[in-house]
Amino acid sequence: MKKRSRRFSTLLKQIEADKLYSPLDALNLMKNLSNVKFIETAEVHIVLGLDPKYADQQLRTTVMLPKGTGKIMRVAVITQNNKTHEAKSSGADIVGGEDLIDEIKKGRLDFDKLIATPDMMMSIAKLGKILGPKGLMPSPKAGTVTHNLITTIKEFKAGKLEYKIDRSGILHIPFGKLNFNVEDLHINLITLQESIDRNRPQGSKGKYWKSVHINSTMGPSIPLDIQLLRNNYVL
């Protein structure tokens, strides 16, 4: 078992054992416990009653966080012809066609999101082993294969993010930075909750939400009361 630092152990003592916190109480506590010298990311970890080995229990979609993620997104676009100018004028940081595909083959990965037009996907398929493990492979489900570059680029720049369950049926989602005020973090968290409920897979049976915890990058995990979260509870 990994040994906890004295700093982390001290923070952990400030979380009441067996208590399920209201969303706002948890967010306030998370911010108050932060004592590092950089701006931490706020993360939520949600255990769902899904078994991802079944096709009808997969959960992968996108959501637009109203208050953004707090992260400056570097967006790359693979396209060609007249779409190249469209991508550049819409704010893409990197734009290319076959030339960019070749650069990625050689190791270029200085971007956070890769968007592509459908006509480039056959060429991009050869990058699967490079992009797949890093979660950068464009796909229609992730909203990153599109003809509508203008809207897609602007949305990802503004705070749109993709989330999907891991092999254990757990979601791990960043929903802001600790320099956000509590109200803005709460709005983003509720937006995530509504998206997860709205996109419940058809094959989901029994209890859908099993547990919810939030934490900052270097902070301890704080358990949330699921019902208060799903009722859009405001103290």
Swiss-Prot record:
Record field: transmembrane: none
Signal peptide: none
Subcellular location(s) of the protein: Plastid, Chloroplast
Keywords: Chloroplast, Plastid, Ribonucleoprotein, Ribosomal protein, RNA-binding, rRNA-binding
Covalent S-S links between cysteines: none
GO molecular function (one): rRNA binding
One Gene Ontology cellular component annotation held by this UniProt entry: large ribosomal subunit
GO biological processes: translation
UniProt record similarity statement: Belongs to the universal ribosomal protein uL1 family.
Oligomeric and partner information: Part of the 50S ribosomal subunit.
PANTHER family: 54S RIBOSOMAL PROTEIN L1, MITOCHONDRIAL (PTHR36427), LARGE RIBOSOMAL SUBUNIT PROTEIN UL1M (PTHR36427:SF3)
HAMAP family xrefs: Ribosomal_uL1_B
Biological function: Binds directly to 23S rRNA. Might be involved in E site tRNA release (Potential).
Protein name in UniProt: Large ribosomal subunit protein uL1c
Protein species of origin: Gracilaria tenuistipitata var. liui (Red alga)
Gene for this chain: rpl1
